[in-house]
Structures are given as structure tokens and as C-alpha cells.
From Swiss-Prot:
Induction: Strongly expressed under conditions of alkaline pH but not expressed at any pH below 5.5. Glycans are attached at N41, N173, N261. It is a lipid-anchor; GPI-anchor. This is pH-responsive protein 1. It comes from Candida albicans (strain SC5314 / ATCC MYA-2876) (Yeast).
């Protein structure tokens, strides 16, 4: 029975739960089946949320602080603002705030306490504007892993952290579904990190857009497979109900029917169409009615602050808050709701372990592999880096990496440093830093050219590493050294790579012939992969702002 499962789970996590701050006012919320529940009494938790962040896309509003290096504003690090705004959240019956970018180097204690005292939970995105999974050239690498775990380390101590988003609208149409494999790998690894760190079991999920061609497949994809790999919850940024509408005519009925069999909680990670202002928010009564609460776990209205996009509930000027008509309508509707709530006492033991079969990739609209990218392993990358005989010179600017990748990958097969989320194939060094990956392929070319000194030069951009060590002991925790990664279920081609962990080349060559310049003819990388690698590096070093 579920009561036995819950008792065992409670015992297993008792130590970590006792360390959570503010538990008396905001007991931890847990996931069981397709709903959230309060851990202390088993009552269903429905999200009554507001998106809470200014300048989430990366610009800095004047007056927030004078730090020129700040890339975004972390609202949970501004205690004065939290004190200013909490009354408006309480008055509008709010129990959840979504924050899109956390600064893990800032202090969040005071804001988290303010919101906990008000019964408010936080669901936070793990990325930030310049460190996120890029839908056009997706990676799951060490920089992202470090960023994500750093946010978790900072926020895990608070009982009113409801969960973490590992991505927001990364895949947004049929052309970039492969990016979802990288987000799902991030979810898998963050769940594992939380568990291995002995933190309480904080849910990790994904926030999707509402694209009609992929919305069913993407929901199934993130909720399918093993319990270790799948998302703990699934959010949809939903803007279908505009002005005066109904459950049937808005599309809500169809969306509810489409995901009614989802085995994890689903909710509106954003909602609030602004085609007509002031917004009436008549959808709130339906969202929290019996028509939807068995399938949906509430929603997060977009957004608190009035900005250029005209989605705000209030206008803020310094410490002055002016409520808009949108806020008044929202507040009125939120204070009318009286939803029926489920309870864990009605669940069976199977509810906690149900899962879905992953969507196939035969259809043209869905191509994300179930074989996921490997876990980024810093010690493995360091080991490989130390073993390379030819490396990129330390004085080479990162801005020049793209040209070097383009040059060397025109000579050899660079699949060892590339990743393909549609085929489920991930190179042995695909998650390492740009510098390590560039050194890897420079070394591969150097070995392929029989260690000719001229093959490790590239006009002074490469140099011989006289301290190179044997690489036979380089082993990745995830098993990536053999080209393997995890599979979240279903059938997909197993990940593989043509290069060994030592960086030696195994690309095919012609029958001993060489070009007039003395360069062996080797298997060249496909133009698609080559352009992809160059674009990734260019975006990285150029500080490209991507969707997060």
C-alpha cells in the first residue's frame, strides 16, 4: 500500500528533511503519481503562482545595482523588494513564485524566509541567460553541469523550494526536437546529484511551449522511461485562453484530454494571454475546477512586473508599487477559487511508479533519441587533457577557436567531440570544455600525421605537450569512454564514437597516399557537424544570449 511506501521513503529521507529550513511554515512538497502533495499531511498541492523576475532575458534595469558585470537580476537576492512585494502575493492568494535565473553567489536567506512565512514556494530555473542549453546547437557539458549543481547547492536547504526547471522552451518546434535529449540528460543528472548529495528529494522538471505539432510527443518524452531518467514534473507555457472564452472553446478541454494519462504532475508554467487588456483571467475558475485539477496541478501567471511586453500585474518604480487592472482582476479571480483536493490516502502503491513508453522517432515531427548524452565528467576530461601530446596553445584567444575547429575538422573526423541528439550518438569528449575538445582534435590530427612536428603547429596555435601522460587510466563515471550513455526507454541507436579515450585517431585513411602538402587524406567530418561545432564555439565565446 502507498502508506508503507511513504513510511519507507520518509524514513530514508528523514535526515535530509530535518535540515530543511522553514519547514514549519512551508513543509516540503513531494511528487506522487501525477500530483504534488504536502509531505506533512498528504493533501494535494495546487500551484497558485506568479512569474517573479525583472529583466529575466539578461538586461539590467536601472537602479537595481551598479554592478556592470551582472547579467540578470535575481529577485531572491533583493530583500527590500521581497518585503515590498510579499503583501501583493498574499492578497492574491499566491503560493508559488517562478524565478528564471538564480545567482548562486548571492544570499537568499532573507527572501526565502519572507516568502516561507507567507506560505510561498519557489520553483526556479537552473540556467541563466548565457549559460543554458541552446536549442540550435544543444550540448550538455561541464559548464552547464557546474552551473546547475551550483544553483541546487545554494537552494536545496530551503523547504519552500518546490522544484527546479532544467530547461524552458529549449525545443520549440519540429526542427529542434533533438535538443530535448540534452535537457532530459540534465534532468537525469540533477536528480542523481540531489540523491547522491543526500539532499531532500527536490523535483526536477521541464517547461515547454505549446506547439501543436510536438506538444503531445514532448510531454510523453519527458515523462517516459525509467524513474531515474524521466522528469519529475512537466510545465506548459499556455496562452490559449484569451479574453472571454470557455473550457471547450479555449482549447483547454483538448489539452486536458491530450495529457490525461501523463504519469507526472503537469501544470501551466506560464499562462495569461494579453491579446486583450486588461486581462480578465476568467480561465482561473476553470483551471482550478474539477474539470482540470485531476490532470493539472494549477499554474503560474505571467508575470508580476510590467515591462515592455505588457504582461505585468503591477508597475514598480523604486519602492513604489502600483497595481494594474490586470492585478485587480487576477486577485479577484484567485480569491474565488475553492478547488477539490486529492489525498495520498487514496493512492495505491503502483501510482508512485507508473511510467510511459517513449514516443518513437519515425514521425517527422519528433526526432529526440531515447539514448541520452552522458554525464559530464570533469575528472575524465582532465585526465584526457593531460594525456594529449598536441594541444591548443595557451595564448590562443577563445574567439579564434571556431576557425581552428573549422580547419582541423576539415582534415579529420571530429565525431569524438560532437553530439547528436537525434541519433543518440555522443563523442567521448563531447561534454568537455571547448579548450579540451579543441586540443583533443588537434592531437587526433597530430597522431594521424605520424607525429610530424609540422602537424602540431597551426601557425603557432598548437604546441607539443612534453608532459603528456598515458591515458589508459582515463575512465568516465558514466561509461562514456566506450561511447555509452543512458537510455530512457524505447529503442534508439546506441551512442558510439570512432575515437578512443587517448585521442588517437581511428578515422579511415586512403591507401597510404597523401596530398601535395604532406597531409594524409583522412575521413572528413560532415559539413553539418562541422558547422554545428563552429557555431557552438562561436556562440560560447561571443556570449550569445539564448533561450533559458
Amino acid at each position: 500500500m502507498y502508506s508503507l511506501i511513504k513510511s519507507l521513503a520518509t524514513f530514508a529521507t528523514l535526515f535530509s528533511l530535518t535540515l530543511a529550513k522553514f519547514e514549519s511554515s512551508t513543509p516540503p512538497v513531494e511528487v506522487v503519481g501525477n500530483k504534488f502533495y504536502f509531505s506533512n499531511n498528504g493533501s494535494q498541492f495546487l500551484i497558485r503562482g506568479i512569474a517573479y523576475q525583472q529583466d529575466a532575458a539578461g538586461s539590467v534595469s536601472s537602479g537595481y545595482d551598479a554592478d556592470p558585470n551582472r547579467k540578470y537580476n535575481d529577485p531572491l537576492a533583493d530583500a527590500d523588494a521581497c518585503k515590498r512585494d510579499v503583501k501583493y502575493f498574499k492578497e492574491s492568494n499566491t503560493n508559488t513564485l517562478r524565478v528564471y535565473a538564480i545567482d548562486p553567489d548571492k544570499d537568499h536567506e532573507e527572501c526565502m524566509k519572507i516568502f516561507s512565512d507567507a506560505g510561498i514556494y519557489i520553483v526556479a530555473d537552473l540556467s541563466e541567460p548565457t549559460v543554458s542549453i541552446n536549442r540550435n546547437n544543444p550540448e550538455w557539458n561541464l559548464d552547464l553541469y557546474k552551473r546547475y549543481t551550483k544553483v541546487i547547492d545554494k537552494m536545496q536547504e530551503y523547504s519552500n523550494v518546490l522544484g527546479f526547471f532544467a530547461g524552458n522552451e529549449v525545443t520549440n518546434n519540429r526542427s529542434n526536437t533533438d535538443a530535448s535529449a540534452f535537457v532530459k540528460a540534465a534532468i537525469r543528472d540533477m536528480k542523481k546529484y540531489i540523491k547522491e548529495s543526500d539532499y531532500r528529494q527536490i523535483p526536477v522538471g521541464y517547461s515547454s511551449n505549446d506547439d501543436e505539432e510536438i506538444r503531445v510527443a514532448i510531454a510523453d518524452y519527458f515523462s517516459c522511461g525509467s524513474l531515474d531518467d524521466r522528469a519529475d514534473f512537466f510545465g506548459i507555457n499556455m496562452y490559449e485562453w484569451c479574453g472571454k472564452s470557455t473550457f471547450e472553446t479555449s482549447g483547454y478541454k483538448d489539452r486536458t484530454e491530450e495529457i490525461k494519462n501523463l504519469t507526472i504532475p503537469a501544470f501551466f508554467s506560464e499562462y495569461g494571454c494579453n491579446a486583450n487588456r486588461p486581462r480578465l483571467f476568467q480561465e482561473i475558475g476553470t483551471l482550478y475546477s474539477d474539470k482540470m485539477t485531476d490532470v493539472w496541478s494549477g499554474g503560474i501567471v505571467y508575470m508580476y512586473f510590467e515591462e515592455a511586453n505588457k504582461y505585468g500585474l503591477v508597475s514598480v518604480d523604486g519602492n513604489s508599487v502600483k497595481t494594474l487592472s490586470d492585478y485587480n482582476n487576477y486577485k479577484s479571480e484567485m480569491n474565488k477559487i475553492s478547488p477539490s483536493l486529492a489525498h495520498t490516502s487514496t493512492l495505491s502503491s503502483s501510482d508512485a511508479s507508473k511510467t510511459l513508453q517513449c514516443p518513437g522517432t519515425a514521425a517527422s515531427t519528433w526526432k529526440a533519441a531515447t539514448n541520452l548524452p552522458p554525464t559530464p565528467d570533469e575528472s575524465y576530461c582532465d585526465c584526457i587533457s593531460k594525456s594529449l601530446e598536441c594541444v591548443v596553445a595557451d595564448d590562443v584567444d577563445k574567439e579564434d577557436y571556431g576557425d581552428l575547429f573549422g580547419q582541423v575538422c576539415g582534415y579529420i573526423d571530429c565525431s569524438a567531440i560532437s553530439a547528436d541528439g537525434s541519433k543518440g550518438e555522443y563523442g567521448v569528449a563531447s561534454f568537455c570544455s571547448d579548450k579540451d575538445r579543441l586540443s583533443y582534435v588537434l592531437n587526433q590530427y597530430y597522431l594521424d600525421q605520424d607525429k610530424k612536428s609540422s602537424a602540431c603547429d597551426f601557425k603557432g596555435s598548437a604546441s607539443i605537450n612534453s608532459k603528456a601522460s598515458a591515458s589508459g587510466s582515463c575512465k568516465a563515471v558514466s561509461g562514456v569512454a566506450t561511447g555509452k550513455a543512458s537510455s530512457s526507454g524505447g529503442s534508439s541507436k546506441s551512442g558510439s564514437s570512432s575515437a578512443s579515450a587517448s585521442g588517437s585517431s581511428s578515422s579511415s585513411t586512403s591507401s597510404g597516399s597523401s596530398s601535395s602538402s604532406g597531409v594524409k587524406a583522412t575521413q572528413q567530418m560532415s559539413m553539418v557537424k562541422l558547422v554545428s561545432i563552429i557555431t557552438i564555439v562561436t556562440a560560447f565565446v561571443g556570449g550569445m544570449s539564448v533561450v533559458f
